[in-house]
């Protein structure tokens, strides 16, 4: 999982 996907704007999974 990633904080935030730059290419696909979506809700962050784990911060």
Curated annotation (Swiss-Prot):
What does the entry's PTM section describe? Contains 8 disulfide bonds.
Name of protein: Cysteine-rich venom protein Bco13
Role played: Weakly blocks contraction of smooth muscle elicited by high potassium-induced depolarization, but does not block caffeine-stimulated contraction. May target voltage-gated calcium channels on smooth muscle.
- Record flagged with keyword Secreted: yes
Offer a single GO CC term for the protein: extracellular region
Top-level taxonomic group: Eukaryota
Q: Which UniProt keywords apply?
A: Calcium channel impairing toxin, Disulfide bond, Ion channel impairing toxin, Neurotoxin, Secreted, Toxin
* Tissue and organ expression note: Expressed by the venom gland.
Q: Which organism is it from?
A: Bothrops cotiara (Cotiara)
Compartment(s) where it occurs, according to its Swiss-Prot or TrEMBL record: Secreted
Q: Is Nuclease tagged as a keyword?
A: no
- Which family does the record assign? Belongs to the CRISP family.
Signal peptide (UniProt feature, chain positions): none
- A Gene Ontology molecular function term of the record: calcium channel regulator activity
């Amino acid at each position: 999982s990633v904080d935030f996907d730059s290419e696909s704007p979506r809700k962050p999974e784990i911060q």
